[in-house]
Amino acid sequence: MQGRVAGSCAPLGLLLVCLHLPGLFARSIGVVEEKVSQNLGTNLPQLGQPSSTGPSNSEHPQPALDPRSNDLARVPLKLSAPPSDGFPPAGGSAVQRWPPSWGLPAMDSWPPEDPWQMMAAAAEDRLGEALPEELSYLSSAVALAPGSGPLPGESSPDATGLSPEASLLHQDSESRRLPRSNSLGAGGKILSQRPPWSLIHRVLPDHPWGTLNPSVSWGGGGPGTGWGTRPMPHPEGIWGINNQPPGTSWGNINRYPGGSWGNINRYPGDSWGNNNRYPGGSWGNINRYPGGSWGNINRYPGGSWGNIHLYPGINNPFPPGVLRPPGSSWNIPAGFPNPPSPRLQWG
């Protein structure tokens, strides 16, 4: 019985502990935040008051401020003009008056600011330094021609008449600009003296994009023109022509110009499709000499159509209907001689 009661109470106690844990955590976090805010309020010095030394300060010593740190030096200072009568303004000794020499105030007299605001101001200061430097370089490159004025790095005569504070800021910017020029080396000096605007002006004005020679048109095939052009050996020829001499017709493959379309003879003036060596033959004539009739395949002209004898006027030595293949003696009757030449064909 007691075991059952203990088993039922254990989950209940665990549930109560889980419900109380968030409240305990919230209380502990709130106490820590209050302590941190109190420590920050006591550690930050007020304007015109020295830092109080007490047990809280001894327990949490303040870090010493480095006057050479870039972040603190780049924080914009809130300068206030001194009154003309020399008396301090309203507020008593809480507001410190600037000395007549316009020097920087002491570190202890700076007003307390939020660290996030200080970081944002430092970032804006860096961005403002980078942008005017580039803009000044571009404006000097456009406005000043080579040899017409001083370089961007040289000091202008207006800088001599500036106030001491402005001169200090100018020296600070010059000291920050020196490492960049040293890292660039001789190339940086060349770029600063002769900016790359000449190359852009050679490409952009008065001639198409991509050409570096303004006197030559784009795509003309000569030197200095655009890519992808192939010069033609004979520009006066017609498109598709393959002959070396210009002026021939399209598709002419003769060695000499003036022939008709499709003529493959060596000499011009022949008819279409003539394959004879000499002109004047009829269409389809394949004899060696002109003058033969159509279909004549004899060696000498004058024979009739279908004549297959070597010489004209010679009859067939065999009777009609006798088959005699060339170069063989089968199917030939007895008593007949073999043909005199193996070149004879069927009758």
Swiss-Prot record:
Subcellular location: Secreted, Extracellular space, Extracellular matrix
Biased composition (Low complexity): 148-157
Keyword Signal on entry: yes
InterPro entries xref list: C6orf15 (IPR026135)
Signal sequence region: 1-26
GO annotation (BP), single: extracellular matrix organization
Keyword Signal applies: yes
Cellular component terms per the entry's GO annotation: extracellular matrix; extracellular region
Any matching Pfam family: STG
Biased composition (Polar residues): 41-60
Self-association state and partner proteins as the record states: Binds to numerous extracellular matrix proteins.
PANTHER family in UniProt: SIMILAR TO RIKEN CDNA 2300002M23, STG PROTEIN
Protein's name in the database: Uncharacterized protein C6orf15 homolog
Organism: Pan troglodytes
